[in-house]
Amino acid sequence: MATEGLAGALATVLGGKGLLVQSCDSEPAGKPLFPVRLRKNVCYVVLAVFLNEQDEVLMIQEAKRECRGTWYLPAGRMEPGETIVEAMQREVKEEAGLLCEPVTLLSVEERGASWIRFVFLARPTGGVLKTSKDADSESLQAGWYPRVSLPTPLRAHDVLHLVELGAKFCQQAMHPLILPQELPCSVVCQRLVTTFTTVQSVWVLVGTVGTPHLPITACGFTPMEQRGGIKVAILRLLQECLTLHSLAVETKGLLGLQHLGRDHVDGVCLNVLVTVAFRNPGIQDEPPKIRGENYFWWKVLEEDLQKLLLYRLQESSVIPLSR
């Protein structure tokens, strides 16, 4: 990929869009990569936050035996063959009775590659709110409740943070409206936009194997990788080309993600914004030295692209990625 191609790829990723995953630049040691499968080695969960003009939150009352009678946000596991958005819409219809459309991804949570939760801000488009007369195995009922006075008992208190995240986004968007892109991927992986900045310039790490490209690192499923989370795969790739003990590495968040659950292809690719800086900066006008020949630092010269990238970095204009 020439410089024009790299600029186009970076613009695509910064715009929340996706790119085909051709291969991975870094893979876990040992066993070869194998395609991931829902219900076998990965679990994806969807959750929706709804806030109306009265500052009320859509809550559902759980019917499951282990948490029956408690309250939570509409949520559930993805099924094979679904897109992420389809799964969210199905869960909302089953648990709350409403039809809906996504507004944006609010956050992505992970416990390693085997468990990922996609949190949406959504709006209702139709349907009939589920009442206690409609109780079934999916939920007992649904209702709108003041954000400052949610029904109790809550199934789990993590909803409080997610509701506040949604309210904050409604008041002032922290990042562009971003939705999952429907592009297939066979593994759980991350496309890295790894940056190094000085007062005047910004560089992006590029993979050289094949056509120059934004590098991709595959996530592993060993106990150590599950404990460390998907950041382990980021550090693995960077360790292959940089001397990390002298550097500070920060995962800023997500620029977007892609998935297409068709033909038994259940992988997901997260586009992740990462910063690299010297621990003892002093006056550093050049990025850290690359080891080997599989990567290089690309200096972004396109003014519009440089401004956009610096804005996303300085304002942390990304989807939160948390554990």
Curated annotation (Swiss-Prot):
It catalyses: 8-oxo-dGDP + H2O = 8-oxo-dGMP + phosphate + H(+); 8-oxo-dADP + H2O = 8-oxo-dAMP + phosphate + H(+); 2-oxo-dADP + H2O = 2-oxo-dAMP + phosphate + H(+); 8-oxo-GDP + H2O = 8-oxo-GMP + phosphate + H(+). Gene3D superfamilies: Nucleoside Triphosphate Pyrophosphohydrolase. Its cofactor is Mn(2+); Mg(2+). The keyword S-adenosyl-L-methionine does not apply. GO terms for biological process: dADP catabolic process; dGDP catabolic process; GDP catabolic process. GO terms for molecular function: 8-hydroxy-dADP phosphatase activity; 8-oxo-dGDP phosphatase activity; 8-oxo-GDP phosphatase activity; metal ion binding. Its EC number is 3.6.1.58. Residues 37-167 form the Nudix hydrolase domain. Mg(2+) binds at residue 58. A motif (Nudix box) lies at residues 76-97. Keywords: Hydrolase, Magnesium, Manganese, Metal-binding, Nucleotide metabolism. It is an enzyme of class 3 (hydrolase). Pfam families: NUDIX. InterPro entries: Nudix_hydrolase, NUDIX_hydrolase-like_dom_sf, NUDIX_hydrolase_CS, NUDIX_hydrolase_dom, NUDT18_NUDIX. Belongs to the Nudix hydrolase family. Mediates the hydrolysis of oxidized nucleoside diphosphate derivatives. Hydrolyzes 8-oxo-7,8-dihydroguanine (8-oxo-Gua)-containing deoxyribo- and ribonucleoside diphosphates to the monophosphates. Hydrolyzes 8-oxo-dGDP and 8-oxo-GDP with the same efficiencies. Also hydrolyzes 8-OH-dADP and 2-OH-dADP. Exhibited no or minimal hydrolysis activity against 8-oxo-dGTP, 8-oxo-GTP, dGTP, GTP, dGDP and GDP. Probably removes oxidized guanine nucleotides from both the DNA and RNA precursor pools. This is 8-oxo-dGDP phosphatase NUDT18. The gene is Nudt18.
